[in-house]
Amino acid sequence: MTSAGNPAVDPAARPFQGGRRLPLTWLGVTPFFVYVGLFLLLPTVVIVAGSITAGDGSLTLANLTNIQQAYLVKAFLNSFIVSLVSALIGAIGGALLAYAVATGNPRGALRRTVTSASGVLAQFGGVTLTFAFIATLGTIGFVTLFLKDRGLDVFANGVWLYELSGLILIYTYFQIPLMVLVFLPALDGIRPQWREATESLGGSTWHYWRYVAGPLLAPAFLGCTLLLFANAFSAYATAAALISQGGIIVPLQISNLFTSETGRAQPGLAKALALAMIVVVAIVMLLYALLQRRTSRWLR
């Protein structure tokens, strides 16, 4: 029995010798930190070290300066174009679809169908997605042949599917569902009472969106757009499956520099490119986090 002067002590909170408590509450997140350390921090350290190391093991900045070569700068520019255009298209299309879902029945079939499909399609990329587009819109795809039989040649001005425009089209396929998933919570945070208050004060729909909903949703929309940009900027598998030769975007250039078939592999330069990508994505995600923090103030 426990006396009144000696209450029972929870074994999980029993102190060590010296007064320190056993931090059992941290055990639940230990696998997360191990995962982050192995698959995020450790690769980053390897990339940073490799980007400033020469082939003989000595320190050098040549790899970092060599990323200024014209063909690598062009690859970065192409990556920015593909990421920005697909992010804007995905953000606008996804926001409109998310708004249609948010204004509908919260337990209706439309919301369940769209959210379930978005959860699947947002992760539907790589070889599978590329094959689907090639089988549909490739040079001998069934849609291409169907239109050609009716006098419409979609590739009359070139096989654009295997160029930047094709990448933008394919990236948009998973950008729109991702936008639905990340922007829908912000739309759900808009309360109907705010529109009613605007109307009771004599405001129109324009006033509601201009002075109430618009300013509230703008940080969330911009943050989600940045997330889509980072998602497209770092994508590799889809582009690699679509474009087997050449390196029109940075991830493909990194792959080519690692696995050169002519014996001229440059792993140091490849790691320098990867480091530049990490810096770009880190800046984008930092801006995204700042915008999300501002959005969370009124979503509480």
Where are these regions (language model features)?
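Non-cytoplasmic
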Residues: 43-47, 179-180, 220-256
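Membrane-interfacial helix termini and adjacent extracytoplasmic/periplasmic loops
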Residues: 18, 61, 130-172, 206, ...
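C-terminal transmembrane helix and the adjacent membrane-cytosol boundary/short C-terminal tail
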Residues: 2-11, 16, 26-28, 46, ...
